């Protein structure tokens, strides 16, 4: 599933190419792609028509386009009171221009400059929905995203406050990193990478990790996702691409995830893999020793 860096790459591409554009036509090719929009495909289509994309937003793994009316008004003066929320799921893609495989095209929106914005999703776990904007902690976010915590790359992310929350959690630190209500944007890949950089085993209880070490871990999470952003995100297959259909290449720089049986880049010990929450955790047994039972 795309994590923060991959979603941010898509957001930046959309911000550059669709901000200020007006939706002139919409077609829903697969109803499952709008299942989260409770009013149904016809309502989503009708409400999207003639709206102007006034901006883009992201909170953790959630992406949205802010929408406004008043096409005759300058963009800066158009009010944005609702948003198109996009969840990429496991394989969702927001593509501009030609779609390489129309079999997986779920939604298409035509913009006033002739560009087509397409939602392509092979596994159909993602989708679009419309939602009102609400104000949470001084920021306007779509209502379904209001419960999602800020992520380590958010300028208003409060590292000290998150450390205090983590210190009260009597469960594994990796479980807490994956909890989007505690800190958002971190999935399995970047959790393992952050834990490796901070030399913490993901099975340790969050409450047993010192405040200083937790702060270091959150800093490592910010660093690794910044590094991933610079390389276009992580692509293990063709399912994650940016708006131009291009894959990222941070997978070549991973230090932990997927490296079972390979030497640790830091100490040379052989990397291991454990099962965790129906996922795999990759770690160095020397740099990140498991907690004693």
Curated annotation (Swiss-Prot):
Residue sites binding DNA per the record: 104, 123, 169
Cofactors, names only: Zn(2+)
Gene Ontology process terms (BP): base-excision repair
The protein's Enzyme Commission number: 3.2.2.23, 4.2.99.18
Catalytic activity: Hydrolysis of DNA containing ring-opened 7-methylguanine residues, releasing 2,6-diamino-4-hydroxy-5-(N-methyl)formamidopyrimidine; 2'-deoxyribonucleotide-(2'-deoxyribose 5'-phosphate)-2'-deoxyribonucleotide-DNA = a 3'-end 2'-deoxyribonucleotide-(2,3-dehydro-2,3-deoxyribose 5'-phosphate)-DNA + a 5'-end 5'-phospho-2'-deoxyribonucleoside-DNA + H(+)
Active site: 2 (schiff-base intermediate with dna), 3 (proton donor), 61 (proton donor), 279 (proton donor)
Cofactor remark from the record: Binds 1 zinc ion per subunit.
Role: Involved in base excision repair of DNA damaged by oxidation or by mutagenic agents. Acts as a DNA glycosylase that recognizes and removes damaged bases. Has a preference for oxidized purines, such as 7,8-dihydro-8-oxoguanine (8-oxoG). Has AP (apurinic/apyrimidinic) lyase activity and introduces nicks in the DNA strand. Cleaves the DNA backbone by beta-delta elimination to generate a single-strand break at the site of the removed base with both 3'- and 5'-phosphates.
Summary of subunit composition and partner proteins: Monomer.
Annotated protein name in UniProt: Formamidopyrimidine-DNA glycosylase
């Amino acid at each position: 599933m795309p994590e923060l860096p991959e979603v941010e790459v898509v957001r930046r591409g959309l911000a550059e190419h669709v901000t200020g554009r007006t939706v002139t036509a919409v077609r829903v090719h697969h109803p499952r792609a709008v299942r989260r929009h409770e009013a149904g495909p016809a309502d989503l289509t009708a409400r999207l028509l003639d709206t102007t994309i006034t901006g883009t937003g992201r909170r953790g793994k959630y992406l949205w386009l802010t929408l406004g009316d008043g096409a005759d008004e300058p963009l800066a003066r158009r009010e944005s009171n609702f948003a198109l929320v996009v969840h990429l799921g496991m394989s969702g893609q927001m593509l501009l221009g030609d779609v390489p495989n129309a079999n997986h095209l779920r939604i298409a929106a035509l913009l006033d400059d002739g560009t087509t914005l397409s939602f392509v999703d092979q596994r159909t776990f993602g989708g679009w929905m419309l939602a009102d904007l609400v104000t949470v902690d001084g920021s306007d976010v779509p209502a379904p995203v209001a419960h999602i915590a800020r992520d380590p790359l958010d300028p208003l992310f409060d590292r000290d406050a998150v450390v205090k929350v983590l210190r009260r959690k009597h469960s594994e630190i990796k479980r807490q990193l994956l909890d989007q209500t505690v800190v958002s944007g971190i999935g399995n890949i970047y959790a393992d990478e952050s834990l490796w950089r901070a030399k913490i085993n993901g099975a340790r209880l969050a409450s047993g990790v010192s405040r200083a070490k937790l702060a270091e871990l959150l800093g490592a999470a910010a660093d690794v996702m910044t590094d991933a952003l610079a390389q276009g995100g992580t692509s293990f297959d063709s399912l994650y691409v940016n708006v131009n259909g291009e894959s990222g290449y941070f997978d070549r720089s991973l230090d932990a995830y997927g490296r079972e049986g390979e030497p640790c880049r830091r100490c040379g010990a052989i990397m291991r893999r454990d099962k965790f929450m129906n996922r795999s955790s990759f770690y160095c047994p020397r740099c990140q020793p498991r907690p004693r039972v």
